[in-house]
């Protein structure tokens, strides 16, 4: 057993019955999988048209909705149309139609959803990234007296629809049954998209543009580093979207190499994700990766990764570099930093043998 084993988690194969989602899928469910984790996110490949969720909010935590090509080797090949609604008033939501790789920031108390995957000509990836260890949401409903009520739902408290004696394990069976019933009704001449009609009626009202600032289209980033596929994509926090609390990259590793340097983060966690490059085949991971971890930069432990994995890097834990010892097929290396600016501390040895610590960050004066 290693000292830092609790920080290294192999993502399990999640077999499920969710209609329109590739199975198995990769899902990191925060504290239910790793104590003290502060991120909860999935890697879902959407393969069919479907509708999910109702308007809801999150009380105190940002969420990010990510839509990209499912094959990260062809990140910008996005042959789909997705409708998403955002707004402060659940009866006056504004429609956003996504036709290219996009990330949406959902700040606390902003209503969002439904999500209508109304055309899927080629699989796309959908990730709901929740910046807390336990996912939760607040739903609004109007009771018989016409008064608003707000119900809480979250990981660990939802009960199984089929068997109330059991906790919901998100198998997707109830969703799939409802989705298939909805699609059958939609085929009828008079039914149409009855469930979605009120939301499309809202879209006919004048737009305020208030929520445009929360929607960011990924930009192709051409580069000359032969270790990573070009162009690549990323979301660099404040430099892309003011007040955002997320900074991460999609690095498609092409060959054996060593990247990064030994460093630590002063006050922010980091998560390092290693996954298959095609989200429809998430667990196809033909590589061997090594990384060193330790509280003391002179005494580090080496961890070897041979399957999809997430590593939690708490503040002040030294880590790196990352050595891709064998790359049989491209893999996705995703450094994930839940803050608006990225920063790290490195150690430099002076000529007299003493140590000097240097901060490097995107928030430094230009």
What are these regions (language model features)?
Residues 50-64, 72-80, 257-271, 279-287:
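A short beta-loop-beta micro-motif enriched in histidine and acidic residues
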Residues 96-117, 303-324:
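Conserved metal-binding segment of the jelly-roll/cupin
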Residues 1-56, 153-159, 184-262, 366:
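A short, N-terminal "cap"/entry segment at the start of jelly-roll beta-barrel domains
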Residues 67-99, 274-306, 346:
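A short beta-strand-loop-beta hairpin characteristic of the jelly-roll/cupin
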Residues 48-51, 86-92, 108-112, 255-257, ...:
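Short acidic (Asp/Glu) patches
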Residues 3-11, 115-160, 182, 186, ...:
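Double-stranded beta-helix
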Residues 160-182:
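Cysteine-cluster motifs in flexible loop/terminal segments that predominantly coordinate metals
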Residues 61-65, 79-81, 123-126, 245, ...:
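Extracellular structured ligand-interaction cores
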